[in-house]
Structures are given as structure tokens and as C-alpha cells.
């Protein structure tokens, strides 16, 4: 158009991406996991999550397919770690509910580097930051069982995470999953826990 005047092009928005407000479900494929008493269990698990920050979700994960893959990785990793700390009888019994609550809670944290932790608002003292210590083999504590550091250990971590006093531990930094990906894992459930086929 070559005539004079001001012209507007509509629509102003090229495309709209919609995200579901409802709970989304991810069914993980059955996995053979080793328990603390060195027995294999085939565990079939599912998790439900929701999008709590659509903009951050879109920036980090783009779509539900990517989100399902990420949720699957996170839940599978935490389930594998938790099952390795529990006996087969505990996983099959009523204690299963407590185990699933621990997996859900751990799955709602995203690991970040020390540098990323320092760059959070408030740095290593940020209310959004969780610092966990994992004992290595050869210590008095159960290897792989994460725990919160004591006040003295927190002071050491802030000064120098490689100090001799922390040699028997690996230090990890976590932020809430909602701050990392804009999602929150609401529930993790075992559909089935069977002995492997012989």
C-alpha cells in the first residue's frame, strides 16, 4: 500500500501458547531398583505436577513433553536414591507412604552449582537455598543419606567447601523446582512394586 497515513498491523500477537492449569501426570516406565538389603524390585511409579509459573516454564522447558522428560529424570533419580536407602520389606509395607513423601519432597528441589547459589538473592544465606550434605563411604554415617548441615558445617561451607573438616561429605546446593523450571511436583506414587521375573 503506497498511500500516505499511519497503518497498524493486527493482530499484535503472532501466536499464543496455552498451558494446562490442571495437574499433569507423568508415568515412568517400570525400573528395576536395588534396595538397601541388595534385593531387586521392579517399581512402576507415576508423578503429578502442576505449572506454577507459566513464563518461567516456557523459558526453561517450552512444552509438556520436555517437562515430562525432566520430571521423569528428577523423580527417577530421587526414587533410585531413596530405594537404595530402604529395605525391600519397607518399600512393600505401609512405610511406602513415608518413602513417597520423601521422594516428592526431594524431587521438588533442583540442584544448582555453588556459583549459582552464591548469585541468588542473599547468596548462601538465601531463604530459597537448601544446602545438603551427603556422606561418602568410610564415614560413620550412611553413605548416600542426605542431611542438613549443622551450624558449624554451614560456617565451614561458606568459608571453604573444600576444607578438611568436610572431606567425608559431598556438599550440594538446591533451589526450589518452582524457581528453576516453574513447576511443582504435587504427588509421587508407586503403582506397583514387584519382584523381578525369574
Question: Can you describe what each PLM-predicted range is?
Answer:
Residues 19-36, 57-61, 170-172:
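N-terminal post-signal-peptidase region of extra-cytosolic proteins
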Residues 48-56:
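Short, charged/polar surface micro-motifs in flexible loops or helix N-caps
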Residues 1-9, 47, 179, 198:
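Short intrinsically disordered, low-complexity coil segments enriched in acidic
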Residues 56-57, 195-198:
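Short acidic, Gly/Pro-enriched loop/turn segments at secondary-structure junctions
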Amino acid at each position: 500500500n503506497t498511500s500516505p497515513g499511519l497503518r497498524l498491523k493486527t493482530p499484535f500477537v503472532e501466536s499464543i501458547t496455552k498451558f494446562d492449569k490442571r495437574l499433569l501426570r507423568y508415568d515412568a516406565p517400570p525400573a528395576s531398583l536395588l534396595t538397601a538389603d541388595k534385593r531387586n524390585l521392579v517399581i512402576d511409579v507415576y508423578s503429578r505436577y502442576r505449572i506454577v509459573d507459566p513464563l518461567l516454564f516456557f523459558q526453561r522447558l517450552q512444552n509438556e513433553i520436555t517437562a515430562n522428560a525432566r520430571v521423569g529424570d528428577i523423580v527417577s533419580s530421587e526414587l533410585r536414591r531413596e530405594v537404595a536407602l530402604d529395605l525391600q520389606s519397607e518399600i512393600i509395607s505401609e512405610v511406602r507412604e513415608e518413602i513417597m513423601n520423601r521422594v516428592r519432597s526431594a524431587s521438588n528441589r533442583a540442584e544448582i552449582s555453588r556459583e549459582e547459589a552464591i548469585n541468588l538473592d542473599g547468596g548462601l544465606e538465601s531463604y530459597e537455598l537448601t544446602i545438603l550434605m551427603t556422606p561418602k563411604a568410610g564415614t560413620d554415617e550412611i553413605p548416600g543419606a542426605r542431611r542438613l548441615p549443622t551450624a558449624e558445617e554451614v560456617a565451614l561451607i561458606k568459608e571453604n567447601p573444600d576444607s578438611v573438616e568436610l572431606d567425608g561429605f559431598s556438599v550440594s546446593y538446591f533451589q526450589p523446582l518452582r524457581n528453576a523450571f516453574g513447576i511443582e511436583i504435587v504427588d509421587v506414587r508407586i503403582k506397583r512394586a514387584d519382584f523381578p521375573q525369574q
